[in-house]
Curated annotation (Swiss-Prot):
Any GO BP annotation: microtubule organizing center organization
Gene encoding the protein: CLASP1
Protein keywords: Cell cycle, Cell division, Centromere, Chromosome, Coiled coil, Cytoplasm, Cytoskeleton, Golgi apparatus, Kinetochore, Microtubule, Mitosis, Phosphoprotein, Repeat
Subcellular location: Cytoplasm, Cytoskeleton; Cytoplasm, Cytoskeleton, Microtubule organizing center, Centrosome; Chromosome, Centromere, Kinetochore; Cytoplasm, Cytoskeleton, Spindle
Region ranges (Interaction with PHLDB2 and RSN): 1254-1538
Name of the protein: CLIP-associating protein 1
Organism: Homo sapiens (Human)
Entry keyword Oxidoreductase: no
Coarse class of the protein's main subcellular location: cytoplasm
Function, in words: Microtubule plus-end tracking protein that promotes the stabilization of dynamic microtubules. Involved in the nucleation of noncentrosomal microtubules originating from the trans-Golgi network (TGN). Required for the polarization of the cytoplasmic microtubule arrays in migrating cells towards the leading edge of the cell. May act at the cell cortex to enhance the frequency of rescue of depolymerizing microtubules by attaching their plus-ends to cortical platforms composed of ERC1 and PHLDB2.
Length: 1538
């Protein structure tokens, strides 16, 4: 007999390894045969269980043969199911990722094969890789390596077009610093493979990732080797890595062939020629270590030793604690054998690799190890010292800034190792300090380093300046700001140091310091003697790499990429064409190998004004030439070119003597050669085709530049060369830039690109402002902000700043979109701004130094989460900069930041941190509002709570601003629902200030909401009732006024809905609201007859068709409905007369039929003529308001929306008796005379007079019952009732005996005497109990709502017997007429559950019986929707009663419906399972058992957070229930959870 799916599942789930090996091949054959396994494709549940079993039990098995069989079975399923296997990918991927790190080669290889097969047959590669990114951070190094190998295989199998590589590359970059060398090699190989497929764009992108130069050099060398080998398979159509914002947008498009024509050798030369100083790179440390002699170690040795430790497992935090205590005991006692101490130090690294940092208590224990580390670092055994330094370096590299306390404590001890004569100890200390500086950026380390810069030991001083240089290169400016003066003083002392090598290092430090704090650096420069100034200049001049000028290239603006970026990235990644060689007369290039720097000290304004003032600048400015300028000025720190001549772009160099007779190498741009052919290009410094947009394509279109035009003819040019922003053209006639000037050289209409200088403005050149012309064929001049071009002639004052500010107003653009989303234009990239901070203001202190992009989002978040207030402030600064640079956060980052912000709402440092937090919050909301829907509840409620706190006025204003931004940023309906939830939340106890804030917020929200945003839900009704109680708040007049205004605002917002909402509330609430609304209408009619909304300033323009459509209210079918004159907005005299006011309870007007109108008029025509009301009309409409609200039959939102969905209008149920269209003129009924010519009432007023709709059985269920209950109930006119309905409904109307009606009227009168006449009311209730058992349809149709409301009010009676009797009557009505409760379910359930709190057992028993009947009478889905929020928020015993009631409901609900509601049900039950009351816990378990009996194993995924013991208990009850019910022979079990 062929095995079926059930037997297959049983075989898969069995634990016996031998049997698994036997049935494995059978399962493969079975799944491969479509005929045998036909049911495989139909039973999705069984398939899910099968795949889950294979993934968890087979693929994760410890027996590699079982693992291989499991993969084979999965492979067969993939082959069989094809793309239908896509739903299972999420189940199998975690196991397959784990297997990538398996010890067996065969397992790893088969795993790779299976993954590729899934990408090929089940889903596209990107879908799979999106779910595999976590593997890059896997704790098993083989898995991390395997992920890289899998990426290589994917690229070779599917090509680069199938992947969005921009998502993957950052993860690979992280692995470049992995402790394991195999992982690092695999990461490099994967980058090389990406390069092979994508091309030069990868090189440019990596340059901006902030990677150490040594690593970049290694990677770029491999790139060059691949390119030389001819193995490149780049396609011009690859869009996956195309021109993301991090790729240089100035190069030609990918269709250009220039990228592959640049000689590889020149690229390598450029890369090596721009190597950063050796002290900061691994290569540098290696070479320096080699010079140290035998025994010296370097960073490479340390990194290898990081994971050269025994493997340990951490099973719990207790286990971790015991391990660290044992380590501390060994390390704290130097009497232990040195080998034990070495092993203890290694074990710390083992624990780190095993994930110790993920445990909360790890950092507490780490602090206790400070003393032990100090002792180890002082040990006489070099091996112990070496291991201690390695461990400290490892801690810093893994923990980053979290190692701050340990680093600060141990650093002085490590410095004492530096002068040690034992090389192993000295170099270990040096490498440890380097690693700590590189990974732990804590300002408190700076004084430790600077204090050692004055050490008596020459070796220590040299090393300290080297460390200081590394620190200035690696750290961000905001981390240094605190110690500017200390750094400046230390560098000054270093420049004067007695040791020549220390002085050299100090001069390097000066340039690093200058890149961060240019103004302070210039000040320092001027305090130096001339000999030291010359030494600094010669240091700059004689450098044949950028060793002496590590930061001249780096923007000190706000991105990590630009801060840590090597100079090799500064050339265009595609190279330049050789066909554009300059023809300008030249002299030979200097052969010294030093960089040729051109004159760039030309102020834009100086050049513009030089037409009228042609004079030599040497006599007027102290620094008239680049050579004479101080290093702090723009010229001397000039445009460091990266030997572009060698790549063939090349501009020739002419030597021209300057004012001082020195010979300067003048680089003439290619664009200057073509002035006549390209006027717009004159003066451009750029020679790349991607930058010279105008040169090869006929120039820019007219109007692209608003600056002074350049004449085509060179003869017509002024003798004063015109500075085109970043022009490199030099002349003795030009005026040098004064030292104190803060004017940048903004790029104007020409391309001053990123690769020529970071000082220049980076955003406004046409090279960035236009898409590549070779792709689109023409430029887009409109992209250049006019204010930027105008900068050429602006003064250096606020005019320029204003222009810059204007240009900065760019649309927000997300930063990390997939490669290929952007064109070559990177004007909106994060690296672009009108001018970088380096060029605009920061050099001479224009804008604060902390306005720079933070180096790493993770670090910013760590700062924000710090317990130290100053670090939190620092983190907020960094976050502000990230947000201002439009760096959007990933989903994971957003989640963490939301958690941090939630905690920050309670930050105690209000002035220091909370104020800045509020500023950051506003930016955060504006940028990420689309991703913060889930956090909106916390955001809104916390801000409102803060409005009730005692804050400074300035802070309070910021809270208010955050609220305003929140209100404008999120959907109004969502905000309104949250506020309703917040008001009814029993766990919240807002103070008076918070209440006022909530109410004012609702009022302002109501002004902007659409009527459809106001939803009449149970929460809204509860909230409105609470607001009504706030109108009588005895302690605060502000709360009373605000609550009244809110009620009026909601009434104005959606009058039909609000009126129906009031109709569902108890009479006491109705009375309070009705009185308020009466006064409001009365006052508004006195002050302005135009609109009742004037009292709260509501704008008439808010009326929309959805809001004002009268067809959504019962009014349209009654006396208050719209007449044709209302529809057309005419006066009454122009069309017809209107129905009279509802003068008497028994007067029955005939409603006009709107069928003809309905065909002719759309809802948009329904604008009310609210300007033509007078006070007499309003007063006449108020006569029956109280009774109308009281008797208004509440109808659910579903009933209201149903006809709207059908044709956009509410069907009018009442038509004239003969079926013809009724005349607009109304007939008088009951002796009431019609007043002629009165206009229709305003919709709001007429709705207050709405009569309750009748609930006739059958299709006429919404006909009106025009007879409100009143003292005159017995005077109703039967014939009038019959005229108000269809003829065919007459048979459904039963003649209610007069005595019954009289009896009911008397009973209701009696019951309305609350807390009085106890015995009489008991008799009335008993009489009513008898009537409920009789079939008196007419009575119930007329009086049901009144009876129900009176019964619910009676539940609050003083006499307990009355309360119990009322519950019995209510239960009897429920049993006999359950359908009538459909629209009153919420109110009835809540009142019944509240009765469970009663102190008398008799009442509680009656309440339990009523709740049981409710559970079996009301529709199950409706019942559960009401019960779920109560279970989650109510206290004992209400939550117990609600859970019991829900259990009964679950027993009668369909499986499909229950599955849909599980998401709402389970949280409350899990919460109940944790309740302190045992009865609540027990009820929750029974409810879960009931749910399991309905849906079975589908309950399993929802119980993931239950502990093992709770799962066992639940399983026990499930088995017991199954045994009792004998429903199943086998005891199905929910999976046990440990």
């Amino acid at each position: 007999m062929e095995p079926r799916m059930e037997s297959c599942l049983a075989q898969v789930l069995q634990k016996d390894v031998g049997k698994r090996l036997q049935v494995g091949q059978e399962l493969i054959d079975y799944f491969s045969d479509k005929q045998k396994s036909a049911d495989l494709e139909h039973d999705q549940t069984m398939l899910d269980k099968l795949v889950d079993g294979l993934a968890t039990s087979w693929v994760n098995s410890s027996n590699y043969k079982v693992v291989l069989l499991g993969m084979d079975i999965l492979s067969a399923l993939v082959t069989r199911l094809q793309d239908r296997f896509k739903a299972q990918i999420g189940t199998v991927l975690p196991s397959l990722i784990d297997r990538l790190g398996d010890a067996k080669d065969s397992v790893r290889e088969q795993d790779q094969t299976l993954l590729l097969k899934i990408m090929d047959q089940a889903a596209n590669p990107q879908y799979v890789w999106d779910r595999m990114l976590g593997g890059f951070k896997h704790k098993n190094f083989r898995t991390r390596e395997g992920i890289c190998l899998c990426l290589i295989a994917t690229l070779n199998a599917s090509g680069a077009q199938t992947l969005t590589l921009s998502k993957i590359v950052p993860h690979i970059c992280n692995l470049l610093g992995d402790p394991n060398s195999q992982v690092r090699d695999a990461a490099i190989n994967s980058l090389v493979e990406i390069y092979r497929h994508v091309g030069e764009r990868v090189r440019a992108d990596l340059s901006k990732k902030g990677l150490p130069q040594s690593r970049l050099n290694v990677i770029f060398t491999k790139f060059d080797e691949v390119q030389k080998s001819g193995n490149m398979i780049q396609s011009a159509n690859d869009k996956n890595f195309d021109d993301e914002d991090s790729v240089d947008g100035n190069r030609p498009s990918s269709a250009s062939s220039t990228s592959s024509k640049a000689p590889p050798s020149s690229r390598r030369n450029v890369g090596m020629g721009t190597t950063r100083r050796l002290g900061s790179s691994t290569l540098g440390s290696k070479s320096s270590a080699a010079k140290e002699g035998a025994g010296a170690v370097d960073e490479e040795d340390f990194i290898k030793a990081f994971d050269d430790v025994p493997v340990v497992q951490i099973y719990s935090s207790r286990d971790l604690e015991e391990s660290i205590n044992k380590i501390r005991e060994i390390l704290s006692d130097d009497k232990h054998d040195w080998e034990q101490r070495v092993n203890a130090l290694k074990k710390i690294r083992s624990l780190l690799l095993a994930g110790a940092a993920e445990y909360d208590n790890f950092f507490q224990h780490l602090r206790l190890l400070d003393g032990a580390f100090k002792l180890s670092a002082k040990d006489l055994r070099s091996q112990v010292v070496r291991e201690a330094c390695i461990t400290l370096g490892h801690l810093s590299s893994v923990l980053g800034n979290k190692f701050d306390h340990g680093a600060e404590a141990i650093m002085p001890t490590i410095f004492n190792l530096i002068p040690n004569s034992a090389k192993i100890m000295a170099t270990s200390g040096v490498v440890a300090v380097r690693l700590i500086i590189r990974h732990t950026h804590i300002p408190r380390l700076i004084p430790v380093i600077t204090s050692n810069c004055t050490s008596k030991s020459v070796a220590v001083r040299r090393r300290c300046f080297e460390f200081l240089d590394l620190l200035l290169q690696e750290w961000q400016t905001h981390s240094l700001e605190r110690h500017i003066s200390v750094l400046a003083e230390t560098i000054k002392k270093g420049i004067h140091d007695a040791d020549s090598e220390a002085r050299i290092e100090a001069r390097k430090c000066y340039w690093g310091f200058h890149s961060h704090f240019s103004r302070e650096a210039e000040h320092l420069y001027h305090t130096l003697e001339s000999s030291y100034q010359k030494a600094l200049q010669s240091h700059l001049k004689n450098s044949d790499s950028i060793v002496s000028l590590p930061q001249s290239d780096r923007s000190s603006s706000s991105s990590q990429e630009s801060l840590n970026r090597p100079l090799s990235a500064k050339r265009s990644p595609t190279g330049s064409t050789t066909s554009r060689a300059s023809t300008v007369s030249t002299k030979s290039v200097s052969t010294t190998g030093s960089l040729q720097r051109s004159r760039s000290d030309i102020d834009v304004n100086a050049a513009a004004s030089a037409k009228s003032k042609v004079s030599s600048s040497s006599g007027t400015t102290p620094f008239s030439s680049a050579a004479a300028l101080p290093p702090g000025s723009y010229a001397s720190l000039g445009r460091i070119r990266t030997r572009r001549q060698s790549s063939g772009s090349a501009t020739n160099v002419a030597s021209t003597p300057d004012n001082r007779g020195r010979s300067r190498a003048k680089v003439v741009s290619q664009s200057q050669r073509s002035r006549s052919a390209n006027p717009a290009g004159a003066g451009s410094r750029s020679s790349s085709p991607g930058k010279l947009l105008g040169s090869g394509y006929g120039g820019l279109t007219g109007g692209s530049s608003r600056g002074p035009p350049v004449t085509p003819s060179s003869e017509k040019r002024s003798k004063i060369p015109r500075s085109q922003g970043c022009s490199r053209e030099t002349s003795p006639n030009r005026i040098g830039l004064a030292r104190s000037s803060r004017i940048p050289r903004p790029s104007m209409s020409q391309g001053c690109s990123r690769d020529t200088s970071r000082e220049s403005s980076r955003d406004t050149s046409p090279a960035r402002g236009f898409p590549p012309l070779d792709r689109f064929g023409l430029g887009q001049p409109g992209r250049i902000p006019g204010s930027v071009n105008a900068m050429r002639v602006l003064s250096t004052s606020t005019d320029l700043e204003a222009a810059v500010a204007d240009a900065l107003k760019k649309p927000v653009r997300r930063r990390y979109e997939p490669y290929g989303m952007y064109s070559d234009d990177d004007a909106n990239s994060d690296a672009s701004s009108v001018c970088s901070e380096r060029s605009y203001g920061s050099r001479n202190g224009g804008i604060p130094h902390y306005l720079r992009q933070t180096e790493d989002v993770a670090e910013v978040l760590n700062h924000c989460a710090s317990s130290n207030w100053s670090e939190r402030k620092e983190g907020l600064l960094g976050l502000q900069n990230l947000l201002k640079s439009q760096r959007t956060l990933s989903r994971v980052e957003l989640k963490r930041l939301c958690e941090i912000f939630t905690r920050m709402f309670a930050d105690p440092h209000s002035k220091r941190v909370f104020s800045m937090f509020l500023e950051t919050l506003v930016d955060f909301i504006i940028i990420h509002k689309d991703d913060l829907q889930d956090w909106l509840f916390v955001l809104l409620t916390q801000l409102l709570k803060k409005m009730g706190a005692d804050l400074l006025g300035s802070v309070q204003a910021k809270v208010q601003k955050a609220l305003d931004v929140t209100r404008d940023s999120f959907p109004f309906d969502q905000q309104f629902n949250i506020l309703m939830r917040f008001i009814v939340d029993q766990t919240q106890t807002p103070n008076l200030k918070v209440k006022v804030a909530i109410l004012k917020y609702i009022e302002s929200l109501a002004r902007q909401m659409d009527p459809t945003d106001f939803v009449n839900s149970s929460e809204t009704r509860l909230a409105v009732s609470r607001i009504i109680t706030w109108t009588t708040e005895p302690k605060s007049s502000d709360v009373r006024k605000a609550a009244q205004i809110v009620l009026i605002s909601l009434f104005e917002l959606n009058t039909p809905e609000f009126t129906m909402l009031l109709g569902a509330l108890p009479k006491t609430f109705q009375d309070g609201a009705t009185k308020l609304l009466h006064n409001h209408l009365k006052n508004s009619s006195n002050t302005s007859v135009g609109s009742p909304s004037n009292t709260i300033g509501r704008t008439p323009s808010r009326h929309t068709s959805s809001r004002t459509s009268p067809l959504t209210s019962p009014t349209n079918c009654s006396h208050g409905g719209l007449s044709p004159s209302r529809l057309w907005g005419w006066s009454a005299d122009g069309l017809a007369k209107h129905p009279p006011p509802f003068s008497q309870p028994n007067s029955i007007p005939t409603a006009p039929s709107h069928k003809a109108l309905r065909r002719s008029y759309s809802p948009s025509m329904l604008d009310y003529d609210t300007e033509n009301l007078n006070s007499e009309e309003i007063y006449s409409s108020l006569r029956g308001v109280t009774e109308a609200i009281e008797k208004f039959s509440f109808r659910s939102q579903e009933d209201l929306n149903e006809p709207i969905k059908r044709d956009g209008k509410k069907e009018c149920d009442i038509v004239s008796r003969d079926g013809g269209a009724a005349s607009p003129a109304t007939e008088g009924r009951g002796g009431s005379e019609v007043e002629g010519g009165r206009t229709a009432l305003d919709n709001k007023t007429s709705l207050l007079n709405t009569q309750p709709p009748r609930a006739f059985p059958g299709p006429r269920a919404r006909d009106y019952n025009p007879y409100p209950y009143s003292d005159a109930i017995n005077t109703y006119d039967k014939t009038a009732l019959k005229e108000a309905v269809f003829d065919d409904d007459m048979e459904q109307l039963r003649d209610v005996p007069i005595d019954h009606s009289d009896l009911v009227a008397d009973l209701l009168k009696e019951l309305s005497n609350h807390n009085e006449r106890v015995e009489e009311r008991k008799g009335a209730l008993l009489e009513l109990l008898k009537i409920t058992r009789e079939d008196s349809l007419g009575v119930w149709e007329e009086h049901f709502k009144t009876i129900l409301l009176l019964l619910l009010e009676t539940l609050g009676d003083k006499d307990h017997s009355i309360r119990a009797l009322a519950l019995r009557v209510l239960r009897e009505i429920l049993r006999n007429q359950p359908a009538r409760f459909k629209n009153y379910a919420e109110l009835t359930i809540m009142k019944t559950l509240e009765a469970h709190k009663d102190s008398h057992k008799e009442v509680v028993r009656a309440a339990e019986e009523a709740a049981s009947t409710l559970a079996s009478s009301i529709h199950p889905e409706q019942c559960i929707k009401v019960l779920c929020p109560i279970i989650q928020t109510a206290d004992y015993p209400i939550n117990l009663a609600a859970i019991k009631m829900q259990t009964k409901v679950v027993e009668r609900i369909a499986k499909e419906s229950l599955l849909q509601l599980l998401v709402d049900i389970i949280p409350g039950l899990l919460q109940g399972y944790d309740n302190t009351e045992s009865s609540v816990r027990k009820a929750s378990v029974f409810c879960l058992v009931a749910i399991y009996s309905v849906i079975g194993e589908d309950l399993k995924p929802h119980l993931a957070q239950l502990t093992g013991s709770k799962m066992k208990l639940l399983n026990l009850y499930i088995k017991r229930a199954q045994t009792t019910n004998s429903n199943s022979s086998s005891s199905s079990d929910v999976s046990t959870h440990s």
